[in-house]
Structure formats: structure tokens, C-alpha cells
């Protein structure tokens, strides 16, 4: 006799069995890194009573990754042009000035400078 079919409402997904490797140890899940914790912290600083959906968080995470990649590649290009093997805060600052438009670049540079100063003074 076939088992009864679960109703559509409240149906649970079948539990996935973890296939054991030959040495008998369970495989660990690969950690998925994201900026969601930090995005959430900033949101709570700016708007304490506002929440964020998982879809919106995913979009914000993609945005942060995209901006990070653009700045990193531009800074890398600048270091290569100047025959440097190390990306310093100067390359990052120049990359930010090149990538971000007008007033946004000015604010980003001042916040970045403030963060670097705070970091170096705490050492």
C-alpha cells in the first residue's frame, strides 16, 4: 500500500540524506560568505524600526560585491600602471574617485580616510 500523499498546505520537504564519504566522516557544508550581517547592522543604525526581505538583502549583497570588485580591479590596474606590486590606500582612494560619481566619491573618500585613521590610531 502506498503512503498517503501530504496535503499542499503545510507539506514538508523530504529530508535529504547526507551521503557519507568512504572514510566514514560527514561532509561539512561549504560556508557561503555574504555582507548581510553588516548590511543589517547599518540598516538598524539608520532606520531602527525597518526590516529587510531576503530578496532585498540578496540584491544589496550583489551590489556590495559588484562595487567591491569594480574598486579592486581599478586599484589593481592603477598599481600595475605605476609598476607597484602592492595595492595601498592611495590606489583604493584613486579607484573610488574614478568609479563613483561626484558628491558620492567625495563622501566615500572622506569616510574611507576617517576609517583608515581610526584603524591606524587603534593599533
UniProtKB/Swiss-Prot annotation:
GO CC, one annotated term: nucleus
Main location: nucleus
Modifications after synthesis and translation: Monoubiquitination of Lys-118 gives a specific tag for epigenetic transcriptional activation and is also prerequisite for histone H3 'Lys-4' and 'Lys-79' methylation.
UniProt xrefs under PROSITE patterns: HISTONE_H2B (PS00357)
Family membership: Belongs to the histone H2B family.
Function noted in UniProt: Core component of nucleosome. Nucleosomes wrap and compact DNA into chromatin, limiting DNA accessibility to the cellular machineries which require DNA as a template. Histones thereby play a central role in transcription regulation, DNA repair, DNA replication and chromosomal stability. DNA accessibility is regulated via a complex set of post-translational modifications of histones, also called histone code, and nucleosome remodeling.
Annotated protein name in UniProt: Probable histone H2B 3
Organism: Caenorhabditis elegans
Organism placement in taxonomy: Eukaryota, Metazoa, Ecdysozoa, Nematoda, Chromadorea
Gene: his-41
Amino acid at each position: 500500500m502506498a503512503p498517503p500523499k501530504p496535503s499542499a498546505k503545510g507539506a514538508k520537504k523530504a529530508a535529504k540524506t547526507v551521503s557519507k564519504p568512504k572514510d566514514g566522516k560527514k561532509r561539512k557544508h561549504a560556508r557561503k560568505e555574504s555582507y548581510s550581517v553588516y548590511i543589517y547592522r547599518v540598516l538598524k543604525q539608520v532606520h531602527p524600526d525597518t526590516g529587510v526581505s531576503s530578496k532585498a538583502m540578496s540584491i544589496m549583497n550583489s551590489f556590495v560585491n559588484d562595487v567591491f570588485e569594480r574598486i579592486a580591479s581599478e586599484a589593481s590596474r592603477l598599481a600595475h600602471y605605476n609598476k607597484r606590486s602592492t595595492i595601498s590606500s592611495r590606489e583604493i582612494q584613486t579607484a573610488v574617485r574614478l568609479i563613483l560619481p561626484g558628491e558620492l566619491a567625495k563622501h566615500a573618500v572622506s569616510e574611507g580616510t576617517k576609517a583608515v585613521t581610526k584603524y591606524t590610531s587603534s593599533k
